[in-house]
């Protein structure tokens, strides 16, 4: 395979190496990894190949990833800008909170770009409209002239990604173990009228991304996190063990029954189709082969409890429609109890916020719900319960 196309990817972590780079590599792209972690960049620079192992019920398959380079943006920002300026695609998998920190090099590269077609900019994050968010940070650093002609320089497309990367084996190095199932949906409208749609095997281009994003976030992420937080409270180690407990299994299913009702009524998805999707997701996260650690899945509770995320996002919309949200709020309570977990800074910060603020302040600060909104009083009651230790 010839590797004449080039993609720059921010984030040398497991999703970057094991999902995004795998797809790009298998579609003939040379991948340039960008990260600030010395250890990851040094490993990528010293190692010419790494292996992605896809696991599933029917066994495993392995891919060798090569034709990549790596740059440390902490030390060689000018080089990063040059690479992006001459790339076909720039992607990221850094976490939604880091998008603002990877905006400046993209902005500088867009200013410097001389190719006669626009670069494709695609954020691969577990967040709604992450590329739009990234674009806002990028455009804040562009000249007015470039902003006026942005379509000739860059096209920004939101995406929805779905693939579970479980806890990795110790001493695995750069190799990544990942589930076989994958979904990467990208909106295609931004590439109309002169854009260059990335030719990546496995990307599903769609006209309207919102149903795909919400279906994924409010089913996969909601069920996964619900299992994690209930599992943590019940001192269960792995997600599949949570799902093999009938009571906990039913609790997780109840949460995604509520979100399924939203997906069906809001987006016009057939009930049978959404039910089948829910079944597929429950089956996936119940897979013992993944050995998915409860604390890994539960980490970053502040983000997961925020306004547009997997619990409050669907619960707020359902509450505004006068629909049932009991199971989702049960999961919210368990998420609030995910405090002071070793290795997770947000769980420590959550404990601090709960200690230093009133319940009303916590709900506004953490959940983004204001007094007078349908969920407010019920969330306040949950926080008071957690603060009271009951």
From Swiss-Prot:
Keywords: NAD, Oxidoreductase. One of its GO terms (molecular function) is mannitol-1-phosphate 5-dehydrogenase activity. Its EC number is 1.1.1.17. Transmembrane segments: none annotated. NAD(+) binds at residues 7-18. It is an enzyme of class 1 (oxidoreductase). It catalyses: D-mannitol 1-phosphate + NAD(+) = beta-D-fructose 6-phosphate + NADH + H(+). The active site is at 216. Pfam families: Mannitol_dh (PF01232), Mannitol_dh_C (PF08125). GO terms for biological process: mannitol catabolic process. The keyword Flavoprotein does not apply. GO terms for cellular component: cytosol. Monomer. Catalyzes the NAD(H)-dependent interconversion of D-fructose 6-phosphate and D-mannitol 1-phosphate in the mannitol metabolic pathway. Has a strong preference for NADH over NADPH. Belongs to the mannitol dehydrogenase family. This is Mannitol-1-phosphate 5-dehydrogenase. It comes from Alternaria alternata. The lineage of its organism: Eukaryota, Fungi, Dikarya, Ascomycota, Pezizomycotina.
């Amino acid at each position: 395979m010839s590797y004449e196309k080039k993609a720059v990817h921010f984030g040398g972590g497991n999703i970057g190496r094991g999902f995004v780079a795998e797809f790009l590599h298998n579609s003939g792209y040379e991948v340039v990894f960008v990260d600030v972690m010395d250890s990851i960049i040094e490993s990528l620079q010293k190692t010419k190949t790494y292996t992605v192992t896809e696991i599933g019920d029917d066994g495993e398959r392995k891919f060798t990833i090569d034709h990549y380079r790596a740059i440390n943006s902490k030390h060689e920002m000018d080089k990063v800008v040059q690479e992006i300026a001459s790339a076909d695609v720039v992607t990221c998998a850094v976490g939604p909170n880091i998008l603002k920190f990877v905006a400046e090099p993209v902005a500088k590269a867009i200013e410097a770009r001389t190719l006669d077609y626009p670069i494709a900019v695609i954020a691969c994050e577990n967040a709604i409209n992450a590329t739009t968010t990234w674009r806002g940070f990028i455009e804040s650093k562009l000249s007015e002239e470039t902003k006026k002609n942005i379509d000739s320089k860059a096209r920004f497309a939101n995406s929805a990604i779905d693939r579970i990367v479980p806890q990795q084996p110790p001493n695995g190095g750069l190799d990544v173990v990942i589930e076989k199932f994958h979904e990467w949906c990208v909106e295609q409208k931004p590439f109309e009228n002169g854009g260059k749609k990335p030719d990546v095997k496995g990307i599903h281009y769609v006209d309207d991304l919102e149903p795909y994003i919400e279906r994924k976030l409010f089913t996969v992420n909601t069920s996964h996190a619900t299992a994690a937080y209930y599992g943590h409270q019940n001192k269960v180690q792995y997600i599949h063990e949570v799902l093999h407990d009938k009571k906990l299994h039913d609790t997780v299913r109840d949460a995604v029954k509520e979100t399924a009702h939203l997906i069906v009524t809001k987006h016009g998805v057939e009930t049978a189709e959404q039910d089948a999707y829910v079944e597929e997701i429950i089956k996936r996260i119940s897979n013992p082969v993944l050995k998915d650690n409860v604390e890994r899945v539960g980490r970053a509770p502040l983000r997961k409890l925020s306004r547009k995320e997997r619990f409050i996002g669907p619960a707020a919309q359902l509450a505004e429609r006068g629909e049932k949200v009991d199971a989702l709020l049960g999961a919210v309570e368990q998420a609030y109890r995910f405090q002071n977990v070793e290795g997770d800074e947000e769980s420590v910060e959550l404990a601090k916020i709960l200690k230093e603020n009133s319940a009303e302040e916590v709900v506004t600060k953490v959940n983004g719900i204001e007094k007078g909104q349908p969920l407010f009083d019920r969330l306040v009651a949950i926080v008071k319960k957690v603060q009271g230790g009951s």
